[in-house]
């Protein structure tokens, strides 16, 4: 069981209507990941977006900077939008970070729940599924063989070409993030790739059939059962007082849900949704340490995942509040969850 933190680099929205600079948020991110490393948190993931509400469009640059400031923490995308990227270049970038970090780099890829990168990089949304399928196939092949000969529809063919540098130990750990479609789960199992379930709404237990489906598909493709790995990605935020934390964080969280929702036709986000999400059957882990421990243990009992990714900067909370949330997660939440599960801890 591993515990980590993911972020998107949400920009700070100030009460006077101004937005904090990207540079400010990027520098904060590096301080935050340093703290995670010092606390012994297992992994850090940073996402890719091309919108005004997020500071990070190139996760690999943030991870390269983080590699020079950290010693032990695993560094990953969360996620890299593979459909609008070149798998060759993506592998090279993350293999470079892997070399820089002495083997601490992972690559998590997804189709992308935001579509801004498709027109930005010249891809047709009508090819959404086909792009991801072809590019995942190429990425996996690059990770497994060098040199490589390959031909597809959406990029130039490769003819006995070397892809360099190679990752440490000539292998990059690649995860696939899915939003909940059976097809995505089967695809990950077919390629023998570990999978993250992005659970950002509803009742998380509803994902249990997909967990089971993944393991069933994994067995169907005759992979070793011991190698199957699953993770969950869940919105989290921690404070010393549960009620105060919820009350203070709700306006920021709701504002970001509404910024995203305004582009997707969602109705305005309401407090009752937030409160339901914080409850036993909801998909938010927001509150004090006791609430967090209880919720994570319940989710683990129901879903049986190997990794828990606490997504922690939705809405751009203040840097000081994020540092406190990270400290509570690393110093109190993780050790207590591990103890309850009988997992040895060095924290």
Regions found by a protein language model. Give the residues of each.
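N-terminal beta1-alpha1-beta2 module of alpha/beta enzyme domains
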Residues: 1-70, 74
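Conserved, mostly hydrophobic/aromatic
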Residues: 3, 48, 66, 97, ...
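Hydrophobic faces of well-ordered beta-strands that scaffold small-molecule active sites
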Residues: 3-5, 44-46, 75-77, 105-109, ...
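An alpha-helical appendage that flanks or caps ligand/catalytic pockets
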Residues: 5-7, 38, 129-162, 205-305, ...
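Active-site mouth loops of central-metabolism enzymes
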Residues: 13-26, 80-87, 170-180, 280-289
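Internal, glycine-rich beta/alpha segment that forms the wall or movable "lid"
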Residues: 15, 86-193, 212
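Acidic (Asp/Glu)-rich catalytic clusters
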Residues: 37, 63-71, 94, 98-104, ...
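Glycine-rich, proline-tolerant flexible connector loops at the mouths of alpha/beta enzymes
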Residues: 43-62, 81, 113, 201-202, ...
């Amino acid at each position: 069981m591993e515990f980590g933190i993911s972020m998107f680099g949400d920009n700070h929205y100030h009460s006077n209507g101004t937005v904090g600079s990207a540079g400010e948020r990027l520098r904060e991110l590096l301080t935050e990941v340093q703290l995670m490393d010092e606390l012994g948190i297992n992994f850090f993931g940073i996402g890719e977006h091309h919108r005004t509400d997020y500071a990070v469009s190139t996760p690999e640059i943030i991870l390269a900077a983080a590699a020079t400031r950290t010693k032990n923490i695993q560094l990953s995308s969360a996620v890299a939008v593979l459909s609008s990227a070149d798998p060759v270049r993506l592998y090279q970038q993350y293999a470079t970070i892997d070399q820089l970090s002495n083997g601490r780099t992972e690559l998590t890829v997804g189709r992308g729940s935001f579509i801004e990168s498709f027109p930005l990089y010249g891809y047709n949304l009508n090819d959404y599924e086909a792009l991801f399928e072809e590019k995942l196939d190429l990425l996996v092949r690059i990770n497994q063989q060098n040199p490589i000969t390959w031909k597809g529809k959406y990029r130039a063919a490769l003819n006995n070409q070397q892809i360099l540098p190679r990752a440490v130990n000539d292998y990059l750990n690649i995860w696939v993030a899915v939003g909940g479609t059976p097809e995505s789960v089967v695809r990950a199992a077919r390629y023998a790739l570990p999978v993250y379930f992005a659970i950002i709404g509803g009742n998380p237990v509803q994902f249990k059939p997909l967990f089971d489906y993944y393991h069933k598909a994994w067995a169907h493709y005759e992979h070793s059962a011991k190698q199957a790995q699953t993770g969950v990605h869940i919105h989290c935020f921690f404070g010393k007082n549960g009620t105060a934390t919820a009350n203070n964080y709700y306006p920021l969280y709701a504002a970001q849900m509404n910024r995203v929702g305004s582009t997707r036709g969602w109705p305005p986000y309401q407090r009752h949704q937030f409160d339901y999400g914080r409850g036993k059957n909801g998909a938010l882990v927001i509150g004090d340490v006791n609430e967090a421990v209880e919720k994570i243990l319940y989710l683990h009992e129901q879903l049986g995942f190997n990794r828990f990714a606490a997504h922690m900067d939705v809405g751009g909370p203040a840097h000081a509040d994020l540092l406190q949330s990270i400290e509570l997660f690393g110093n109190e939440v993780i050790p207590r969850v591990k103890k309850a599960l009988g997992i040895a801890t060095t924290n």
